[in-house]
Amino acid sequence: MLWFKNLMVYRLSRDITLRAEEMEKQLASMTFTPCGSQDMAKMGWVPPMGSHSDALTHTANGQIIICARKEEKILPSPVIKQALEAKIQKLEADQGRKLKKTEKDSLKDEVLHSLLPRAFSRFSQTMMWIDTINGLIMVDCASAKKAEDTLALLRKSLGSLPVVPLALENPIELTLTEWVRSGTVAQGFQLLDEAELKAMLEDGGVIRAKKQDLVSDEIAVHIEAGKVVTKLALDWQQRIQFVMCDDGSIKRLKFCDELRDQNEDIDREDFAQRFDADFILMTGELAALIQSLVEGLGGEAQR
């Protein structure tokens, strides 16, 4: 649960001090509560250590981790459509006339409310790591929408949260393209065997290469034809493998076994100690990876 699978990275755009003790009280006002009978979705904070602690924050070495939980009611479109059509047909038969569009629209709301109490729920959890030393916030998710939703919850809890996506000086796709074209990457990194290339033109093609030597004539032809690398699988220090995306997101993080086993000497029964040790280890490695990536990709944009 703790080891992040993806990273959406954000920069605190103003100097603000985030302290776990203060955050604990602020998050408490927005703890997770399940959906009521008429709620489509609910989101709130839960302890990052799950049932092992009531604390809504966990902190070590200037790093804070928090966890958001979301419940969404699942109402498949065909189910809504079927119930709505049945209701429309009954009313039209009873009244001997065709219903207007506005009447049908209001009926749809009625149908939704009648179905909600019987709908299944889908639950998801999103971890967020706040690096107070480097002024960064990382969200463990693969989509900007999910990250923004979680940041919005934090903003609401704290009162304000001045953050922007981490921006780099040079377009990421141009740097990734040059790495593949030349076969030379930034120090500490190594090309793996997977990439996605897109044509610069909107209606151009997309090439997805898997299990393939990227420094090859076949790939070079696509680059010469004007395609740019938008996703690239990389290895860092033989410790972490990941896919770098042109939007700045880091996906499919895979920590090497040696790294993950580093805290194996800690008794697994002592969940709190193991969680703390893994958290310190993971955040230390990922902070170093992010710094190396930013430098390797040409540096952070001036703020």
UniProtKB/Swiss-Prot annotation:
Origin species: Salmonella newport (strain SL254)
Similarity section: Belongs to the RdgC family.
Principal location listed in the UniProt entry: cytoplasm
Matching NCBIfam families: PRK00321.1-1, PRK00321.1-3, PRK00321.1-5
Protein name: Recombination-associated protein RdgC
Source lineage: Bacteria, Pseudomonadati, Pseudomonadota, Gammaproteobacteria, Enterobacterales
rRNA-binding in keyword set: no
PANTHER family xrefs: RECOMBINATION-ASSOCIATED PROTEIN RDGC (PTHR38103:SF1)
Listed InterPro entries: RdgC
Job of this protein: May be involved in recombination.
GO cellular component, one term: bacterial nucleoid
Keywords assigned by UniProt, alphabetized: Cytoplasm, DNA recombination
Listed GO biological process terms: DNA recombination; regulation of DNA recombination
Any one Gene Ontology molecular-function term assigned to this protein's record: double-stranded DNA binding
Protein localization: Cytoplasm, Nucleoid
